[in-house]
From Swiss-Prot:
Organism listed in the record: Histophilus somni (strain 129Pt)
Pathway: Carbohydrate metabolism; L-fucose metabolism
Residue sites binding substrate per the record: 30, 109, 131-133
Gene that produces this protein: fucU
InterPro entries per UniProt: L-fucose_mutarotase, RbsD-like_sf, RbsD/FucU_mutarotase, RbsD_FucU
Protein's UniProt keywords contain Cytoplasm: yes
Molecular function via GO: fucose binding; L-fucose mutarotase activity
The name this protein goes by in its record: L-fucose mutarotase
Lineage of the species this protein comes from: Bacteria, Pseudomonadati, Pseudomonadota, Gammaproteobacteria, Pasteurellales
Keywords: Carbohydrate metabolism, Cytoplasm, Fucose metabolism, Isomerase
Amino acid sequence: MLKGIHPAISPDLLKILAEMGHGDELVLSDAHFPAHQLHHKVVRADGISINSLLTGIAPLFEFDTYTEAPLIMMQAVEGDSLDPAVEQSYLQTIKSAVGNVPKLARMDRFAFYERAKQAYAVVITGETAKYGNIIIKKGVTPVK
């Protein structure tokens, strides 16, 4: 065990977070996301919500400030609707952890899948919220 690491962050996920460079993206997917079809590097976080993972990741992760929106979520398919509480809960979780909220953008379902293919890794969570997937983009970690 390490001090200060949230219990939702597995050793495999901690390794991935440390390996990622600036500009790399991480997909936090819901339980139904086709991760293994889209990507070769998949970590399982079964039974863990995306909010729990964001609580653990945000203090360890510098969100990209060189891109317009370092957070990306899927937009609703035509004729379907989003629950705005899902996005708001993610943003509030990040704000609580780091004090500010990076900008969030939405993209079409299939564009999101294509973007996920280019990510550093995909984390399959226990999240069941509709359109609950989120991509987070890592920035440059400041040297202190």
